[in-house]
């Protein structure tokens, strides 16, 4: 998995749920892009906005088993957010490694606070380790840190405090965890 600057992507939980619901109800396997556009499932206002959302959603959908697609539609909000974050982590190495190297490390050491300096330190380390990240613009790097914060907050792993983020362990439906263990990328758990 390559490092990518996904500065224009968002969490897109509603769009993922709507797309999965549409796929399940209509047993769609071909022409997904065309059908989503015709039915305005992604609720976009322009062709470029549709293309941007579709490309992101389609990439993430490929990470989900049919069972996870069903679960993101039918499960509770916290579990749906987790499934959506899982689909992001399956595709975005920079965010996955932050979760593994910073969040998990701190959590395992009973340190439940992530400060701005932790984000900056992670970015500096990754810039040293990867020419790709080192070549991102300063603005691109800043936006990627914002994406990490937003995605992990929306995914249920972080909670914003006054001057830091609190690490929380999301409560996820056991059926979702079991599905990922059996048929998905267990490393992400």
Name each region found by the language model.
Residues 1-82:
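Eukaryotic partner-binding/assembly regions in large regulatory complexes
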Residues 2, 6, 19-22, 26, ...:
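Leucine-rich, amphipathic alpha-helical/linker segments
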Residues 60-63, 101, 105, 125-129, ...:
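Amphipathic alpha-helical interaction surfaces
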Residues 69-73, 108-116, 133-136:
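Short acidic alpha-helical/loop segments enriched in Asp/Glu that coordinate divalent cations
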Residues 83-86, 90-113:
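Positively charged, polyanion-binding regions of nucleic-acid-associated proteins
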Residues 115-129:
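DNA-recognition alpha helix
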Residues 134-189:
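Accessory, usually C-terminal, subdomains that scaffold auxiliary metal cofactors
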């Amino acid at each position: 998995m390559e490092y990518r600057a996904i500065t224009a992507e968002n969490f897109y939980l509603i769009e993922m749920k709507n797309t999965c619901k549409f796929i399940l109800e209509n047993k769609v396997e071909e022409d997904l892009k065309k059908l989503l556009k015709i039915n305005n499932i992604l609720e976009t206002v322009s062709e470029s906005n549709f293309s941007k959302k579709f490309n992101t959603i389609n990439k993430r959908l490929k990470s989900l088993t049919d069972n996870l697609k069903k679960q993101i539609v039918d499960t509770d909000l916290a579990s749906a957010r987790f499934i959506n974050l899982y689909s992001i982590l399956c595709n975005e190495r920079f965010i996955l490694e932050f979760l593994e190297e910073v969040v998990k490390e701190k959590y395992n050491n009973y340190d439940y606070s992530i400060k701005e300096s932790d984000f900056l330190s992670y970015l500096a380390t990754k810039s040293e380790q990867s020419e790709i990240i080192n070549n991102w613009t300063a603005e691109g790097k800043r936006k990627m840190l914002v994406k990490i914060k937003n995605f992990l907050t929306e995914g249920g792993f972080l909670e914003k405090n006054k001057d830091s983020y609190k690490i929380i362990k999301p409560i996820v439906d056991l059926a979702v965890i079991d599905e990922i263990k059996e048929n998905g990328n267990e490393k992400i758990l």
